[in-house]
From Swiss-Prot:
<feature type="binding site">
    <location>
        <begin position="248"/>
        <end position="251"/>
    </location>
    <ligand>
        <name>NAD(+)</name>
    </ligand>
</feature>
<feature type="binding site">
    <location>
        <position position="343"/>
    </location>
    <ligand>
        <name>a divalent metal cation</name>
    </ligand>
</feature>
<feature type="binding site">
    <location>
        <begin position="183"/>
        <end position="188"/>
    </location>
    <ligand>
        <name>NAD(+)</name>
    </ligand>
</feature>
<dbReference type="GO" id="GO:0005768">
    <property type="term" value="C:endosome"/>
</dbReference>
<feature type="binding site">
    <location>
        <position position="119"/>
    </location>
    <ligand>
        <name>NAD(+)</name>
    </ligand>
</feature>
<keyword id="KW-0007">Acetylation</keyword>
<feature type="binding site">
    <location>
        <begin position="208"/>
        <end position="209"/>
    </location>
    <ligand>
        <name>NAD(+)</name>
    </ligand>
</feature>
<dbReference type="GO" id="GO:0009507">
    <property type="term" value="C:chloroplast"/>
</dbReference>
<dbReference type="GO" id="GO:0005802">
    <property type="term" value="C:trans-Golgi network"/>
</dbReference>
<keyword id="KW-0150">Chloroplast</keyword>
<comment type="similarity">
    <text>Belongs to the sugar phosphate cyclases superfamily. Dehydroquinate synthase family.</text>
</comment>
<dbReference type="GO" id="GO:0009570">
    <property type="term" value="C:chloroplast stroma"/>
</dbReference>
<comment type="pathway">
    <text>Metabolic intermediate biosynthesis; chorismate biosynthesis; chorismate from D-erythrose 4-phosphate and phosphoenolpyruvate: step 2/7.</text>
</comment>
<keyword id="KW-0456">Lyase</keyword>
<feature type="binding site">
    <location>
        <position position="326"/>
    </location>
    <ligand>
        <name>a divalent metal cation</name>
    </ligand>
</feature>
<keyword id="KW-0479">Metal-binding</keyword>
<dbReference type="InterPro" id="IPR050071">
    <property type="entry name" value="Dehydroquinate_synthase"/>
</dbReference>
């Protein structure tokens, strides 16, 4: 293995993860995750598989997997996935109706001043409920809010300044708490504002989309876009907690629902083959918003994300593998225009391109290529980039990707059986060129 290659292996858990039936959850098997191998060669990080060393899910006697989500659940036992970062660890709460339980949110509010950052689509639906949850029985807390325009094209410095304007005009001090109420764009912008305002204030994530609930709200990546590339300006800044109220998905547009599934599918491809097999059996249930299926997918995705972040918070190696399809996908978003495609749509097409390149390199079996294409089509996601994307556009945009090191473009590619991937710059450039020519104009 080359020195600039990181390999992530998957060990299949027990083979009896049955297909989802009705509204009863299938109890999940043990999940196996990678750790750094003691046998690594000098200059090489080799990752092998081991069982998850500590439980990241704290729930009541009955796990969320084993019961219908629409049952009334006690607030004393929500499903909790822990992001283990030492003294900066925080919980991800998962369940239905969590915004109705003010004590769960209030325990993570610091100080008496709160700024809720949301957008003009989410505000009419959940802003009042969130303010009520923050202030109910707690008259000493005052809440300000700033409502931003919705969409990826507004994830920029001009829009970010509106958050700072509101915070400064409201004279918020260092003991205030910022609350991100919305999808990935709001979470990224609010988190970056919290990281920057007065050199850092507390913040809470309340994600309202599948995309944000399974991926962007977890792990502390915050930031904004630049006209030359996506997420080029930002910081790693962890929240106090992530509160996933699955009831917020009831108002999510179908296109946004499908977009979020691209990130769910990603986890199965790079590190959790058994989860991918479950997805193949249950993708229609997820699209239909079956509450039990969604709860399982969200929990399992968060477990995977939390484990990776706990091992590699600042994306020095392992965490980069979570970007399968994102290098191609970010190029699509930048080249086609921010907001023209949803993030998950671009990632889906980018994933197909990464899988195609992996196959051209001889690293995966053709059956994996077919399975990836099939599940993305069933998920109502695109499998090719927009026709306007050209080879030169891909190359020029990918040249400024965050994963470029010393002028070398490093990619996340599949290698070996399903559930295995590498983060590497050691690949035949002709395979990349062939993939770009196959999916875009010369």
């Amino acid at each position: 293995m080359a020195a600039n290659t990181i390999s992530l292996s998957n060990v299949a858990a027990s083979k009896n993860l049955n297909s989802f039936q009705s509204r009863a959850f299938i109890a999940p098997p043990t999940i196996f995750f990678p750790v750094a191998s003691a046998k690594s060669k000098p200059g090489e990080l080799s990752l092998s598989s081991t069982t998850l060393s500590r439980s990241r899910v704290r729930a009541g006697a009955s796990q969320l997997m084993n019961e219908p989500l629409n049952d009334q659940r006690s607030i004393s036992s929500p499903t909790v996935v822990e992001v283990d970062l030492g003294d900066r660890s925080y919980p991800i709460y998962i369940g239905a109706g969590l915004l109705d339980h003010s004590e769960l949110l209030q325990r993570h509010v610091h100080g008496k001043r709160v700024l809720v950052v949301t957008n003009d689509r989410v505000a009419p639906l959940y802003l009042d409920k969130t303010i009520d949850a923050l202030t109910r029985g707690n008259p000493n807390v005052t809440v300000e809010s700033v409502i931003l325009p919705d969409g990826e094209k507004y994830k920029d410095m001009d829009t970010l300044m509106k958050v700072f304007d509101k915070a400064i005009e409201s004279r918020l001090d260092r003991r205030c708490t910022f609350v991100a109420l919305g999808g990935g764009v709001i979470g990224d912008m609010c988190g970056y504002a919290a990281a920057s305002y007065l050199r850092g204030v507390n913040f809470i994530q309340i994600p309202t989309t599948v995309m944000a609930q399974v991926d962007s709200s977890v792990g502390g990546k915050t930031g904004i876009n630049h006209r030359l590339g996506k997420n080029l300006i930002g910081a790693f800044y962890q929240p106090q907690c992530v509160l996933v109220d699955t009831d917020t998905l009831n108002t999510l547009p179908d296109r946004e629902m499908a977009s979020g599934l691209a990130e769910v599918i990603k986890y199965g491809l790079i590190r959790d083959a058994e989860f991918f097999e479950w997805q193949e059996k249950n993708i229609e249930a997820l699209l239909a918003r079956d509450p039990a299926a969604l709860a399982f997918a969200i929990k399992r995705s968060c477990e995977n994300k939390a484990d990776v972040v706990s091992q590699d918070e600042k994306e020095s190696g392992l965490r980069a593998t979570l970007n399968l399809g994102h290098t191609f996908g970010h190029a699509i978003e930048t080249g086609f225009g921010y907001g023209e495609w949803l993030h998950g749509e671009a990632v889906a097409a980018g994933t197909v391109m990464a899988v195609d390149m992996s196959y051209r390199l001889g690293w995966i079996d053709e059956s994996i290529v077919k399975r990836v294409n099939k599940i993305l089509v069933r998920a109502k996601l695109p499998t090719t980039p927009p026709e306007s994307m050209t080879v030169s556009m891909f190359k020029s945009i990918m040249a400024v990707d965050k994963k470029v090191a010393d002028g070398l473009l490093r990619l996340i590619l599949l290698k070996g059986p399903l559930g295995n991937c590498v983060f590497t710059g050691d690949y035949d450039r002709e395979a990349l060129d062939a993939t770009l020519r196959a999916f875009s104009k010369s």
